[in-house]
Amino acid sequence: MKKLKIAAIGTEHRHIFGQLKGMLDLGCECVGWWNDGDNKITDDFSEKYPTIKREMDKNNLLSNPEIDLVLIADIPSKRADLAIECMEAGKDVMLDKPGCTSLDQLKRIEQTVLKTKRIFSI
């Protein structure tokens, strides 16, 4: 069976550590991560996972055909847009809660899932 390859995009909340640990414990391989800027969490992420490459351009992860699933734990108001961008790039997504912060975001997520047939999970 093929090993699931994942990436982390948006590491603004500490839940990313639990999300990633759970997936790694299941045998997934994290091939990279991206965050828009630096903070204590990104510093801790780099320290905890020094062998996972940080990309400075998220498009390097979005365009990588080997990545099956993207973990997202950004600021809540940014999660929906990141998820939509990932699904439009052919990736399934697993978000920290809440997955969206408005009914408009929810509607756009639903439309994207129908259009792309990608998995949106929280």
Q: What role is predicted for each listed range?
A:
Residues 108-122:
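Rossmann-fold dehydrogenase core element
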Residues 32, 68-69, 119:
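Short, Asp-centered acidic motifs that coordinate Mg2+ and/or phosphate
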Residues 39, 49-112:
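Beta-loop-alpha module in the N-terminal Rossmann-like domain of NAD(P)-dependent dehydrogenases
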Residues 31, 55, 121:
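General small-molecule cofactor/ligand-binding pocket signal
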Residues 1-49:
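N-terminal Rossmann-like dinucleotide-binding module
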